[in-house]
Structures are given as structure tokens and as C-alpha cells.
């Protein structure tokens, strides 16, 4: 685990985005942790989150020309990431996002921001649960004459969905692209291993991974 990944986990705990305990997920599955990126809800926290995304993206080596944020959660994320890539790495990357409703006046269309045609596009989102927003974004990107280069998310839960694959693995297999995450389940476990006072939570996380976990293919 890289130092920035450990810092991200500490940051997420501090903001109560990441909590350890007993939680029931939408799927009905019992989970020993809960991750709610909506609590990154201030200017300072969003700016810092953008820097973590920029670090993960830059470290991945992915080639792209445009960032894309799926509405609605992806819009502040893609904006913060574009700013961080400029401020931290000197990369002035265009960004775009989609509307949920089509406008018939003004600039019109479903995509707002940098034109996508001919570009390699990296989607920036919070997590991939069912993969719905990523698939919708991929359809828009391809319809605009662009190429999907990959997806960047904050946390990869590394757990099976309905089948043996995780939602992340399903997206990677369907589109033949890598999904980059700031952190993943393995990193959460390593973080807890360094905290003896969190042993009860560590045991639950390890048991959860044993029951539902999948290995990451792209895990820098």
C-alpha cells in the first residue's frame, strides 16, 4: 500500500465517509464497513479528494485526453480532479459531464464541457456498485465518437456481486479497460492491521473478504 492510499483511508475515517461496524447494504448483505462518499461535502474535503484522485490517476500510467464525470455524483469529482491534475502535475486536462435531461436550447445535447470526439476519455466516479452510471457514461462517450480509456473511482470494494465477479471486474471485462481506485478492500485491511485496537474490526473484515472477496487484476 502506498502512503497516499493510507492517507486517503485516514482522511475518509476522519470525515466519517468510512466507518467500521455492522451495516446492511442495499443488496441486503451484512458488511463490516460502510463507505459514503457523499460526506466529502465541503470545499476543503473536495479539494483534498481531488488530489487523491489525481495521484491515483497519474500513478496508473493511463493515457487519456479528457475526464468525464457521470451525473450527478461524478460532476464535483471530475471538476476537483481536473483542478488537482493542473495544480499538482501541471496537466491541463479538459473535462465534461452529462445532463440527466436533454436541453433543446443553448448549447443543447446531453454532454456539457470539453468536446469528446476523437479523444480518449477517463471516467471519474465515486464507486462502482452495479455499474449503471459507468455504462450510461460509456454509451454517451462512444456515441460522441470518443474512446473509453478507463475508469477512476475512490474505493474498490473487491467483492462478488450476483456472480463470482465484482462489479468492477464486470466493467473491466465488458469494455476491456482498467478501473483505477484510490484504495480498495485490501488496503482497508492493511490499514487495520497497523492498529491493534481495531483487531475486532480487522477480524470481521478478513472474514468478509474470505466469504465475498475477489482479487484485483489492476492493482498498482
UniProtKB/Swiss-Prot annotation:
PROSITE patterns in the record: PUR_PYR_PR_TRANSFER
EC number annotated for this UniProt entry: 2.4.2.10
Top-level class of the enzyme under EC nomenclature: transferase
Entry protein name: Orotate phosphoribosyltransferase
Pfam families, per the entry: Pribosyltran
Amino-acid positions noted as binding orotate in the UniProt annotation, renumbered to this chain: 34-35, 129, 157
Family membership noted in the UniProt record: Belongs to the purine/pyrimidine phosphoribosyltransferase family. PyrE subfamily.
Catalytic function, reaction form: orotidine 5'-phosphate + diphosphate = orotate + 5-phospho-alpha-D-ribose 1-diphosphate
Domain of life: Bacteria
Source organism (scientific name): Nitrosococcus oceani (strain ATCC 19707 / BCRC 17464 / JCM 30415 / NCIMB 11848 / C-107)
